Amino acid sequence: MRSKKMTHGLEKAPHRSLLHALGLTREEIERPLVGVVNAANEVVPGHVHLHTIAEAVKAGVRAAGGTPMEFPAIAVCDGLAMNHEGMHFSLPSREIIADSIEIMATAHPFDALVFIPNCDKSVPGMLMAMLRMDIPSIMVSGGPMLAGGTLAGRTDLISVFEAVGRVQRGDMTMAELDEMTETACPGCGSCAGMFTANTMNCMAETMGLALPGNGTIPAVTAARVRLAKHAGMKVMELLEKNITPRSIVTPRAVANAVAVDMALGGSTNTVLHLPAVFGEAGLDLTLDIFDEVSRKTPNLCKLSPAGHHHIQDLHAAGGIPAVMAELTRKGLVDTSVMTVTGKTLAENLAELNARVLNPDVIRSADAPYSAQGGIAILKGSLAPQGAVVKQSAVAPEMMVREAVARVFDSEGEAHAAIMGGKINKGDAIIIRYEGPRGGPGMREMLSPTAAIAGMGLGADVALITDGRFSGGTRGAAIGHVSPEAADGGNIGLVREGDHILIDIPARRLDLLVDEAELAARRETFVPLEKPVTSPLLRRYARQVTSAATGAMYRK
């Protein structure tokens, strides 16, 4: 066993002494040592209950003959970090999470690992570490939050973000907003819609690195605790059979993940996270692959923010197994892939009798919400290397649109203009110098997009940025424009009043300025250099790659 490097032989007597200092017996030290990576904290609503999940995991490990050893991981709440300097640090935390787990699991050579994340960057960060370490491992997340609301109807966190604009517009009172803030997020769990955290937890299940139900079983249920116990027991079986993450995550698993992502209408952040995750296994996932899969995969679900359903509804309708079963009927999922159950996907679906239980929540592949997937990749003179839009959440009026550029060099300037009533129908808000390097950190633009929706402009105004978006964003929100402005991208050449052509069906995003004029602008163009006081962010800006390749560190 891997842990024998730390526990076995004459020379390791001092090591055993330190383990005894933890209260471990000789018998416990001789058993397989299982690292339990727990991202619990008292800051993030999606992580506040993870100690309960960890205790269940450890009980499962002990029941199956192992010795669990828990250690922590950081986690950022993107909702709390939104619209201030804290958001610069969210995406960089993904790499720090992966690196810190590599440090812990190498310095202390565990035989197996159980990963317990829940929210936005903790899930991809842990998946990256899982594939990097490639020892028997399993993931079990904390589960989704239930939707909130009152007798008047359901709400979630995005309802509150958009309500800010409604109050500014005069459509809602502060008293009504205060009531919504107290009811929209009713308890622990990852925010209730198909936002980034829940999308990535569904992806972990789809990849075969988590047990069925991981993406959708609500956080507050006993079923979630039982799932955690099963995960603890299952990792011991994976160890016995030497089933490692890289034996599960193959090119076929990559294709499955992207297909399910498109069927779900998942967060655009998957276009950053999945390439980074699969890259740890030596697998390439390009923007062209995303678009190729999207063009042939039907969009079966419209969960919040694209629709009124939530993750709890997806779970009741059959969950990820039902979505995969429906895609399998059309030959869009390869069911021969291995999973952490120790069985193939086909065997799992058969055991679960996977099927759609509510065709309103999970549409038939014969009658989807749309014939194409939730995400589209756009290219053109404004984004030669690509840009990303959640087309399943775009109003029909904005699918093809020529708009007038309103140019801002930061999120804060743009948000102030929206809230100040300075944005008009037909405008395309350009927010630049918010990319991975230029931000630095590629902040999410949820506050501006929510303000657009709240101000009643969702069907009339586009937002185009080299930054990124929350999974809760809806509307004509086009992000990840590459190359970014800080790297000399054409988004840096846009001027106030320029015309922008958005053509999502044709996959085009063009700056309607002739080549001669663009060349003249480029001759005098000097990218804006923002002052960066944080040493971490300065290092990040030097190391990070383009959003078009997952905003990973340079290898």
From Swiss-Prot:
<dbReference type="GO" id="GO:0009099">
    <property type="term" value="P:L-valine biosynthetic process"/>
</dbReference>
<dbReference type="Pfam" id="PF24877">
    <property type="entry name" value="ILV_EDD_C"/>
</dbReference>
<dbReference type="GO" id="GO:0000287">
    <property type="term" value="F:magnesium ion binding"/>
</dbReference>
<dbReference type="Pfam" id="PF00920">
    <property type="entry name" value="ILVD_EDD_N"/>
</dbReference>
<keyword id="KW-0479">Metal-binding</keyword>
<feature type="binding site">
    <location>
        <position position="120"/>
    </location>
    <ligand>
        <name>Mg(2+)</name>
    </ligand>
</feature>
<dbReference type="GO" id="GO:0004160">
    <property type="term" value="F:dihydroxy-acid dehydratase activity"/>
</dbReference>
<keyword id="KW-0408">Iron</keyword>
<comment type="function">
    <text>Functions in the biosynthesis of branched-chain amino acids. Catalyzes the dehydration of (2R,3R)-2,3-dihydroxy-3-methylpentanoate (2,3-dihydroxy-3-methylvalerate) into 2-oxo-3-methylpentanoate (2-oxo-3-methylvalerate) and of (2R)-2,3-dihydroxy-3-methylbutanoate (2,3-dihydroxyisovalerate) into 2-oxo-3-methylbutanoate (2-oxoisovalerate), the penultimate precursor to L-isoleucine and L-valine, respectively.</text>
</comment>
<comment type="similarity">
    <text>Belongs to the IlvD/Edd family.</text>
</comment>
<protein>
    <recommendedName>
        <fullName>Dihydroxy-acid dehydratase</fullName>
        <ecNumber>4.2.1.9</ecNumber>
    </recommendedName>
</protein>
<keyword id="KW-0001">2Fe-2S</keyword>
<keyword id="KW-0411">Iron-sulfur</keyword>
<dbReference type="GO" id="GO:0005829">
    <property type="term" value="C:cytosol"/>
</dbReference>
<dbReference type="InterPro" id="IPR037237">
    <property type="entry name" value="IlvD/EDD_N"/>
</dbReference>
<comment type="pathway">
    <text>Amino-acid biosynthesis; L-valine biosynthesis; L-valine from pyruvate: step 3/4.</text>
</comment>
<dbReference type="InterPro" id="IPR000581">
    <property type="entry name" value="ILV_EDD_N"/>
</dbReference>
<feature type="active site" description="Proton acceptor">
    <location>
        <position position="470"/>
    </location>
</feature>
<dbReference type="GO" id="GO:0009097">
    <property type="term" value="P:isoleucine biosynthetic process"/>
</dbReference>
<keyword id="KW-0456">Lyase</keyword>
<feature type="binding site">
    <location>
        <position position="78"/>
    </location>
    <ligand>
        <name>Mg(2+)</name>
    </ligand>
</feature>
<keyword id="KW-0100">Branched-chain amino acid biosynthesis</keyword>
<feature type="binding site">
    <location>
        <position position="444"/>
    </location>
    <ligand>
        <name>Mg(2+)</name>
    </ligand>
</feature>
<keyword id="KW-0028">Amino-acid biosynthesis</keyword>
<dbReference type="InterPro" id="IPR056740">
    <property type="entry name" value="ILV_EDD_C"/>
</dbReference>
<comment type="subunit">
    <text>Homodimer.</text>
</comment>
<dbReference type="InterPro" id="IPR004404">
    <property type="entry name" value="DihydroxyA_deHydtase"/>
</dbReference>
<feature type="binding site" description="via carbamate group">
    <location>
        <position position="121"/>
    </location>
    <ligand>
        <name>Mg(2+)</name>
    </ligand>
</feature>
<feature type="binding site">
    <location>
        <position position="119"/>
    </location>
    <ligand>
        <name>[2Fe-2S] cluster</name>
    </ligand>
</feature>
<comment type="pathway">
    <text>Amino-acid biosynthesis; L-isoleucine biosynthesis; L-isoleucine from 2-oxobutanoate: step 3/4.</text>
</comment>
<dbReference type="GO" id="GO:0051537">
    <property type="term" value="F:2 iron, 2 sulfur cluster binding"/>
</dbReference>
<dbReference type="InterPro" id="IPR020558">
    <property type="entry name" value="DiOHA_6PGluconate_deHydtase_CS"/>
</dbReference>
<feature type="binding site">
    <location>
        <position position="191"/>
    </location>
    <ligand>
        <name>[2Fe-2S] cluster</name>
    </ligand>
</feature>
<dbReference type="InterPro" id="IPR042096">
    <property type="entry name" value="Dihydro-acid_dehy_C"/>
</dbReference>
<keyword id="KW-0460">Magnesium</keyword>
<feature type="modified residue" description="N6-carboxylysine">
    <location>
        <position position="121"/>
    </location>
</feature>
